[in-house]
């Protein structure tokens, strides 16, 4: 198996996302080609299905038209974000995540670029993931530069207004001595990459004295249980003995 970003990062990421509940949509299949809105990369059928389930009396196409209109505003996506959260229509069920439709695809092009992985929630491409080959010297650094140039390009305005978060990963653990290694996230219009890393490593091992105390308590509980069982056995034996004596007395 070749050692590259596809085998070491992209495929493992897709497999992990599948375990989380994302359905994979192939984009290179002529038979099952997704019904895409070419201006936004919104999955029209998925959006309609999810919208009509969450809003049985509303029209999905009217909502889609409103979304597309807001995505063209020069407001860095603010209007679309407000519609996503505060619309009279329910675009995403934030209270019951299982009511939403989760899908993913790989290498779905938009204008002049092509994210490695795109995540859809109710048909909306809200998350993009860029993967880099592990131990590549300029991998994440180059992606920071590309990300900045990408959102500065006017032809990507709609796509950047729609995307809520970008993820970048080389599938390597955090290393404080290697600032460009690991997993990062960023907003569409931000050149700042934030790390995914544990803020604190917690030592949850109790001190020796506490361990001894816990062991003693467990032993005491076991002893009490054994004593109770012995008492119950004795009571049962006593009852059986009394029954035998009664039977013997009646027989004689």
Model-flagged regions — what are they?
Residues 214-239:
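Long, intrinsically disordered low-complexity tandem-repeat segments
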Residues 1-216, 247-252:
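An alpha-helical interface "stripe"
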Residues 238-241, 251:
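Ala/Thr-enriched low-complexity intrinsically disordered regions
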